[in-house]
Amino acid sequence: MSHTMTPSEIVSELDKHIIGQNKAKKAVAVALRNRWRRQQVAEPLRQEITPKNILMIGPTGVGKTEIARRLAKLADAPFIKIEATKFTEVGYVGRDVDTIVRDLAEMAIKQTRESEMKKVRTKAEEAAEDRLLDVLLPPPRDIGFSQPEEKDSNTRQVFRKKLREGQLDDKDIELEVAAGLPSMDIMGPPGMEEMTEQIRSMFAGMGQGKKHRRKMKVKEAFKLLIDEEAAKLVNDEELKHKAIANVEQNGIVFLDEIDKIANRSELGGGEVSRQGVQRDLLPLVEGTTVSTKYGMIKTDHILFIASGAFHLSKPSDLIPELQGRFPIRVELESLSVQDFEAILTQTDASLTKQYQALLKTEEVELQFAPDGIRRLAEIAFSVNEKVENIGARRLYTVMERLLEDLSFHASKSSGETVTIDAAYVNERLGDLAVNEDLSRYVL
């Protein structure tokens, strides 16, 4: 939970998945912690404290997008990652920048609904259990001559116990459940996303309240009934208010590939549309009000984190007004041989662990010797230097090439132990790493 984590705790959490790039991690951790700090400030001043947006600059494959992905999991807040290249200025074919906030609102509604349903889950489980028992043991009809049996009779209690122990999971029952409409997708013209959304929700509301009988296993029925009962206990209006407040106060937007909409001074053509997207982004980043189907959303306190490789353009190629909206600049460094080694050994879900787990399913024991790891790191670094620097992604290609034959014949090697040392790596990748023409096409 990000609001209770200190910046150093956030950084150490990111360290489990991303090697190096401490400047970027620190900037992101401080920005995340500042959301919590702002909430502790008294009201007149709190409104004036706006988030300091971040611009991450660095070559591809060094961890910019990965920082965003991991941040999304850490941040107990509405978070959306989008590519700036998807958008065009109003009037062109493409997405309108206001859809960023609408998508963020959808994310917040989903997140809030999940957390609200968790709170009422115990009550929902009890109600679902009673409904299931009513189907398994229909209550006897009262004809008027005798008292109806107690609801929790002995038989009912026996069935309740069996249900809780999972003994009835595979029993087939027929149940009346809410009918779901077949999902339909409505394609609207560019810039008319809001109207399209309204038409979609209008059609979605038409089938509400209808029920139909379905045959299913008790286990599946129990899950369905829990969801139905939880939905009854959640107040939709209250949920909307909470979600909108959460977007306005804690929302985070990660704008990837922002360098692709920067004007490249030496190139002509296409600049109008690029500048248009930047100008459309301006009010959103600075603070405006966007209309969504859940209500109006102010963007004043939404945190924007932008990132780009800036190979062909520079941050100064962005329009000055937009540059000013991203006061915190962080440069990410290219990866060294030591970084590649750390990526292969120190991260929580490193490639070496992934391949070991995959081959273990075929009963092949894969072991990586330190000199083998070092050689792999050297080859990945060397190919990046000679051909095209694609950062950590180069390791995917190198590892796949290294273990190609072993993966193919794994079933025949069942029960064997394979050690990947420097000699093994050189035997399979040595020629490719040395021959620049070959590595250009193969690695």
UniProtKB/Swiss-Prot annotation:
Domain of life: Bacteria
Alphabetized SUPFAM superfamilies for the sequence: P-loop containing nucleoside triphosphate hydrolases
Keyword Transmembrane belongs to the record: no
CDD domains per UniProt: RecA-like_HslU (cd19498)
InterPro entries named in the record: AAA+_ATPase, ATP-dep_Clp_protease_ClpX, ATPase_AAA_core, Clp_ATPase_C, HslU, P-loop_NTPase
GO molecular function: ATP binding; ATP hydrolysis activity; peptidase activity; proteasome-activating activity
Cellular component per GO, a single term: HslUV protease complex
Residues the entry annotates as binding ATP: I19, G61, V62, G63, K64, T65, E66, D256, E321, R393
UniProt keyword terms in alphabetical order: ATP-binding, Chaperone, Cytoplasm, Nucleotide-binding, Stress response
Signal sequence region: none
Localization: Cytoplasm
Pfam families xrefs: AAA, AAA_2
Example GO BP: protein unfolding
Role of this protein: ATPase subunit of a proteasome-like degradation complex; this subunit has chaperone activity. The binding of ATP and its subsequent hydrolysis by HslU are essential for unfolding of protein substrates subsequently hydrolyzed by HslV. HslU recognizes the N-terminal part of its protein substrates and unfolds these before they are guided to HslV for hydrolysis.
Family to which the UniProt record says this protein belongs: Belongs to the ClpX chaperone family. HslU subfamily.
Quaternary state and interactors: A double ring-shaped homohexamer of HslV is capped on each side by a ring-shaped HslU homohexamer. The assembly of the HslU/HslV complex is dependent on binding of ATP.
Protein name per Swiss-Prot or TrEMBL: ATP-dependent protease ATPase subunit HslU
Highest classification ranks of the organism: Bacteria, Pseudomonadati, Pseudomonadota, Betaproteobacteria, Burkholderiales
